[in-house]
Design a protein with these regions (language model features):
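Conserved "right-hand" nucleotidyltransferase catalytic core of DNA-directed polymerases
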Residues: 1-164, 169-175, 181
């Protein structure tokens, strides 16, 4: 297996170090659109709950959960929220806004605001990353030291959502296409 996969190591490293061009204007507009969703949903959630409610706070969500009737729940994950939302239409509305807020926050924080290397989104491919011989990906191994923390460039390419792919553009003489889904 190693002998067969070793030939993939060079292309994996090269692809990760080359990355892909990002259209800065498109990235900014996508990020701004998601920023509007974040602020709109936060205002809506805070109107439906209390003014200092933080959708990312486990404590706040757990308190809300108990207020809405989820007293015996052990956690507040998506499945638990869906279960409570089926019983309580008010909970359904509030959790819908919380989920929209979290989805937009994840999109902005993980993909749209990922640190770029110049104008390029980098990643690291691992040809040995799965048992099924498929490649896995992660943030690039290139980083900057900022005070006491490392800032890695890019994002993992494997789960890049279609919305975030709109900011990518091919280099001159190349095309972008996707063979999965």
């Amino acid at each position: 297996n190693y002998a067969l996969k070793f030939t993939e190591l060079g292309p994996a490293v090269l692809a990760g170090l080359e990355g892909i061009q990002v259209d800065g204007a498109k990235r900014s507009s996508l990020s701004a659109a998601q920023g509007n969703i974040i602020s709109t949903q936060l205002i809506a959630v805070q109107k439906m709950t209390w003014p200092t409610f933080n959708p990312n706070s486990v404590r706040d969500v757990k308190t809300l959960f108990q207020i809405l009737g989820g007293k015996d729940a052990t956690n507040t994950d998506v499945k638990a929220r869906e279960k409570l939302a089926e019983k309580n239409p008010i909970a359904s509305r509030i959790f819908g806004a919380i989920d929209a807020y979290k989805k937009a926050s994840k999109l902005v924080g993980t993909y749209l605001n990922a640190p770029l290397y110049g104008e390029r989104l980098l990643w690291a491919f691992n040809p040995f990353g799965t048992d099924s011989c498929r490649w896995s990906s992660s943030k690039s191994h290139l980083f900057l030291m900022d005070k006491s923390k490392y800032i890695h460039f890019g994002a993992q390419a494997q789960n890049l959502p279609p919305y975030a792919k709109k900011m990518l553009r091919s280099d001159d003489g190349f095309w972008l296409y996707e063979i999965d889904k």
